[in-house]
């Protein structure tokens, strides 16, 4: 109601200046309740799909996030067309949500298109907010003390696990498939991430979380996440300019690194301030509101210095992870993430047009080859990391390499941002999503095979305090 009154008041105030504007504003004011209806109905569909998908995935012992992604594919452009977006090749009349609104409100074609675009924009903004909250949550779950203890072995594994897939993926796409530089770099960057959550769960199930291999894998995965976020911030910024300038690339890498490290170093000072503020506040939200003020401000700073909001959100999570209120904050963020993060994952799936990889269409075969190439590089590029471990005779190198394979949610962040920015064409976008799905599905059985007869009864899940060097 407030929005309606505001739009109407603005249109009345401008009437004496420009005649057509009040009419346009009046039309928009009339459509705003319908836009809200479209947003609400879209959220109903997204939440139902995400919950069903997550529950089915969990039933088969797969990460819920993959269920949310597949649910998005089903309700999106690839199947049911319930949630579609402008630029996908479908119009407002193809959207199931818009069909319902049309039948209720009898909209003209022009009004239907206007509502469709406005509703899609709102859902896209909510999805972007979801990924910011996701990276904030990942930052909160990343233990800086563990980062300091992982030692040189995990650091080397992480660096190689980022460099090899990135270089091989980017070079292969440009040389073999003649992909343009920036899309190739973006796809190569999507190969760098490792999902610590998936790997940790499998290691815990196998009783290998406290083993030397387990400590190296988990430590490397944590560092891998940090490096991956820096890479994402850099390549996403490159996508905005549309060109590769060496000076700009150096600036982005240096500024992203300084921003992240600077935030961590200043974290000790801010932790005390944050704790003092929390103690002084007596009303509801005394912990979560200051935390999100900090997270959103850091996200704003990330954007302001021409990086990415997600880098700022991730840095905020790392900083607050050291605060006295960490445990309370972890629990408070979860329900907020539960509301917004599924919107991101479902919309990533909804935007993915799997039809571009239909093998019966000759023009799609190049896209299929790209998907196969990315999957091979994604697997081999991580497996080689096991052979860079030194000074550890008898260590299971294959298990270390396989443990770095799953991409999980961070890989989907690459796909989502690449799609939203327009830097990825449909075949490349879908190839990245399929790569993420397959590597995440394949990693658990591969890891069980790699450990073979060395499996021991599940441990408590706590990491040993012994430093691997």
Residue ranges of each PLM-predicted region?
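Transmembrane helical cores of multi-pass secondary ion antiporters/exchangers
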Residues: 2-469
């Amino acid at each position: 109601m407030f929005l309606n009154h505001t739009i109407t008041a603005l249109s009345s105030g401008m009437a004496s200046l420009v005649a057509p504007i009040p009419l346009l504003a009046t039309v928009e004011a009339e459509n705003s309740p319908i836009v809200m209806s479209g947003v609400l109905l879209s959220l109903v569909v997204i939440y139902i799909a995400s919950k069903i998908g997550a529950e089915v995935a969990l039933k088969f012992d797969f990460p819920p996030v993959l269920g949310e992604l597949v649910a998005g594919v089903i309700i999106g452009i690839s199947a049911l067309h319930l949630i579609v977006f402008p630029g996908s090749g479908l119009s407002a009349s193809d959207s199931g949500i818009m069909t319902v609104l049309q039948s209720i409100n009898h909209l003209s074609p022009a009004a239907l298109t206007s509502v469709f675009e406005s509703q899609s924009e709102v859902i896209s903004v909510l999805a972007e907010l979801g990924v910011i909250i996701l990276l904030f949550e990942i930052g909160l779950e990343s233990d800086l003390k563990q980062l300091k203890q992982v030692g040189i072995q995990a650091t080397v594994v992480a660096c190689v696990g980022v460099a090899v897939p990135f270089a091989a993926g980017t070079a292969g796409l440009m040389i073999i498939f003649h992909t343009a530089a920036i899309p190739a770099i973006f796809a190569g960057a999507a190969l760098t991430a490792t999902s610590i959550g998936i790997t940790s769960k499998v290691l815990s199930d196998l009783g290998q979380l406290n083993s030397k291999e387990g400590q190296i894998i988990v430590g490397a995965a944590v560092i891998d996440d940090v490096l991956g976020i820096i890479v994402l911030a850099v390549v996403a910024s490159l996508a905005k300019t549309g060109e590769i300038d060496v000076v700009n690339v150096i600036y982005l890498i240096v500024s992203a690194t300084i921003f992240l490290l600077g935030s961590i170093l200043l974290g000790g000072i801010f932790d005390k301030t944050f704790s003092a503020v929390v103690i002084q506040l007596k009303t509801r939200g005394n912990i979560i509101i200051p935390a999100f003020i900090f997270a959103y401000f850091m996200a704003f700073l990330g954007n302001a210095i021409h990086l990415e909001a997600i880098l700022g959100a991730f840095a905020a999570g790392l900083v607050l992870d050291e605060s006295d209120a960490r445990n309370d904050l972890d629990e408070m963020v979860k329900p907020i993430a539960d509301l917004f993060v599924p919107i991101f994952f479902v919309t990533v799936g909804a935007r993915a047009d799997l039809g571009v990889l239909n093998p019966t269409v000759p023009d799609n075969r190049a896209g299929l080859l790209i998907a196969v190439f990315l999957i091979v590089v994604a697997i081999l590029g991580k497996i080689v990391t096991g052979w860079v471990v030194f000074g550890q005779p008898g260590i299971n190198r294959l298990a270390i390499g396989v443990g770095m394979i799953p991409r999980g949610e961070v890989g989907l962040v690459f796909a989502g941002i690449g799609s939203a920015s327009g830097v990825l064409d449909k075949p490349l976008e879908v190839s990245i999503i399929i790569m993420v799905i397959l590597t995440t599905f394949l990693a658990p059985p591969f890891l069980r095979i790699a450990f073979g007869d060395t499996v021991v009864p599940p441990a408590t899940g706590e990491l040993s305090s012994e430093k691997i060097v």
